[in-house]
C-alpha cells in the first residue's frame, strides 16, 4: 500500500508563502519554484498534478497571486479536483464535500 504524499508548488507570486509553509511543514515535497524570479505558473501546476495523479492518496498545494490561474491550469487534468480557498473553513469544505485533491491558495 502506497503512502500519502503531499506536494507543493508555486509561481513567483506565491514563493514567499510557500517558503513559510515549508518551514512549518518540512515533510511536504517542494516542486518549485525555487526563487521569486518570474516563471510561468502552468509549468508548476503541471508538475504538481502529475505527482498527485500517481497515487489516489496524494494531495497537493498550489500557490499563485490570485489562485485563479493555478486553479484553471490544475483542473484541466482529468482526475484533479483543485479548489481555491482563502480561509481554513473553505479549505476544509472543499476537501470534505468536494473531495478536492489540490488546495489552491492566493
What are these regions (language model features)?
Residues 28-30, 80-87:
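Short hydrophobic/aromatic-enriched beta-strand-loop microsegments
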Residues 48-84:
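Helix-adjacent hinge/juxtasegments
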Amino acid at each position: 500500500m502506497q503512502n500519502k504524499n503531499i506536494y507543493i508548488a508555486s509561481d513567483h507570486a506565491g514563493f514567499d508563502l510557500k517558503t513559510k509553509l515549508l518551514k512549518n511543514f518540512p515533510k511536504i515535497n517542494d516542486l518549485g519554484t525555487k526563487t521569486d524570479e518570474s516563471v510561468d505558473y502552468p509549468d508548476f501546476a503541471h508538475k504538481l498534478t502529475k505527482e498527485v495523479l500517481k497515487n489516489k492518496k496524494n494531495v497537493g498545494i498550489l500557490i499563485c497571486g490570485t489562485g485563479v490561474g493555478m486553479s484553471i491550469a490544475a483542473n484541466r487534468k482529468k482526475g484533479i479536483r483543485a479548489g481555491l480557498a482563502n480561509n481554513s473553513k473553505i479549505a476544509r469544505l472543499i476537501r470534505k464535500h468536494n473531495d478536492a485533491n489540490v488546495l489552491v491558495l492566493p
